[in-house]
Regions:
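Membrane-targeting and insertion segments and their boundary/processing signals
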Residues: 2-5, 24, 39
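Conserved N-terminal helical subregion
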Residues: 17-29
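Extracytoplasmic ligand-binding site segments that recognize negatively charged/polar headgroups
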Residues: 121-125
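Asp-based phosphoryl-transfer active-site loop
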Residues: 1-18
Length: 125
């Protein structure tokens, strides 16, 4: 099995004022399909933002999405996304004292620091 893991923004896709390279995206899509390459996006984006980029730029949907700044792993199977429960279990067991609320309280007084919106949160973020 061949695997290609890539970031999305400013690596595979533009982010900012640069235009998308449609020819490069078409080549990426065709080569990864033609050579049966498992595609993994490793990104700070959540699932919704990843899907929006797939739609906007015409890049292929990944087989695996390591998203939310590495705090979630999803697999695309049978027409839908599902969490990799093995990863969730691993993180939970490897960090049994993880307490997001305690961390929030600890950093609450830092000026300029703000939490992301609720839709971008998960138990490990």
């Amino acid at each position: 099995m061949r695997i290609l893991a890539t970031d999305m923004d400013r690596t595979l896709l533009p982010n900012g004022h640069w235009p998308a390279d449609e020819q490069a995206i078409e080549l990426f899509n065709s080569m990864t399909r033609e050579h049966d390459i498992l595609v993994v996006y490793v990104t700070g984006r959540n699932q919704a933002l990843t899907e929006a980029a797939v739609e906007e730029f015409g890049v292929r949907r990944p087989d695996i999405l390591i998203g939310d700044v590495g705090t979630s792993i999803r697999k695309y199977e049978n027409g839908g996304w599902r969490f990799d429960e093995g990863w969730t279990t691993h993180v939970r067991e490897a960090s049994p004292r993880w307490d997001a609320e305690a961390i929030k309280a600890l950093v609450a007084g830092i000026e300029g620091l703000r939490e992301q919106e609720a839709e971008h949160q998960n138990p490990f973020k």
